[in-house]
Amino acid sequence: MFDRQAKALSPSFYFGAFAVLTVIGFLAPIRVGDLPGYDDARYTVVAKQIVLSGDWLNTQYNGAPDFEHPPLLEWIQAAFFSVFGISDFVAKVPSALLGWGTVLLVAWLARRLTGDPIQGVLAMFALASSAYFVKYTARAMTDVPVTFFFLAALCAWSLTEDSAGWYLAAGAFTAMALMTRGLIGFALPAIFGLDLIVARRRPRWGYALAALAVAILPLALWYWRLIDHYGQVFFTAHEAWLDREAFGTLSPSWRRYTGLFEYMFMLAKSYWPWLPFAIAGIVTIIRGRQRRLFVLLIWFVVVLAMCAAAKSRVLRYMLPAYPALSILSAIGLAALIPVRFIQRGLLFATPVLAVAVLAIAIFPPVTYHVPEIRPIASAATAATTSGERVAFYDQGAPLYDEVNQMLWYGGREILFLLSPGELEQALQARQIDVFVVDDATYQTRFKSRIAHEVIAGAGHLVCVRLSL
């Protein structure tokens, strides 16, 4: 064990050091760069509209109701925008802070489950050094927030052994996960139920049923309101989204049965250097038959199964299982390596990590996604008045990332044109004066053919205003 007389070698010292380093490492780099378009800018567009309109219930995207996800992330972002202003940095702050909270909570849960503060520190270090997790703490997306609420629900669940009141807390955090990401939140009741069976625990049924109601009611009320307001319009739009993302047919059809192998392959490629230790942790728990720790295996398997069953397969959907993998890695590391070597490793790793974090904080990596969008969006906004729309056409390709960035960095709704026929129809209707098009389309369809004024050009895009 660590020398209790040497505060610098105690688990509490490392917990504090890693807590400080991770909050710096997560917050400092996001002050630079912009927002990727497809997901990040889409969520923030909804949050920006909440602030501008003052309407927190009727969430809007590009002038239409937003039916994709429940709105908890957008509500959080809108709250930050209301206090700190609308900017790229503020849009990313909620994910960074909740990512930091996830690192802190995983240390607590690992210590509670194993009874070993060293393993709490190791789990914290494993999660904070998982490149894929760290990447998404800098993104204005739902993945890290839902991971935090997922972990918080499981922390509360672990405390139900001590007090039945924690059932309600577990239900509340489950509700937050459901209101952030929808489908993946349903993994939590499954995990709780399987843990009761495997651990042979008798639930307090009154509290358990109340917790289930607390978990489901906010989501049910949200969708009931959408159905009541929009009726068949909601069903049609949401069914199309579910078909596209979750339950639709795959091509080729045999891919319906390959999700498990695809995710295992993605983890095998990316979860380094912790993968061998996570496997060792799984083996240690199974061999030791420690029922208290089986919840980690249930957690990982249930999230994996739900992700594998869906149509859309991206490794970030597995992030709610990363805290479980981190604790498994800590258990495996403690089982394979003598504690004195772990102590020396932490003593060496902490200053190295501190130098790396400070270097990143001072010289953050800067990434700009489609940098030509910002000047084009600003020019299109300046050339129009409130209530006018801007037509957007980029070779007829479904470039929703560019449209989302136009909405985020500009101040006008977009008419997204997806075919040459739609472009011709918009030009002939003359209901929109400002068009943003790709340079090739400008050369063949606008230049020398249509009376217009070039407002701005950047990269492969040209912004024009039609002349009367």
Give each language-model segment a name.
Residues 189, 360-444, 450-466:
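Short periplasmic/luminal acceptor-recognition loop of GT-C membrane glycosyltransferases, typified by
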Residues 93-114:
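Transmembrane-helix motifs of polytopic, lipid-linked glycan transferases
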Residues 95, 135-145:
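Short acidic/glycine- and proline-prone juxtamembrane loop motifs at membrane-interface regions
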Residues 137, 311-338:
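Hydrophobic/aromatic-rich transmembrane helices and adjacent perimembrane loops
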Residues 289, 333-361:
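Signature aromatic-anchored transmembrane alpha helix within multi-pass, membrane-resident enzymes
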Residues 176, 185-289, 304-311:
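Transmembrane-lumen/periplasm boundary regions of multi-pass, lipid-linked membrane glycan transferases
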Residues 24-27, 42-65, 71-75, 79, ...:
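Extracytosolic helix-loop segments that constitute the early lumenal/periplasmic catalytic or substrate-binding loops
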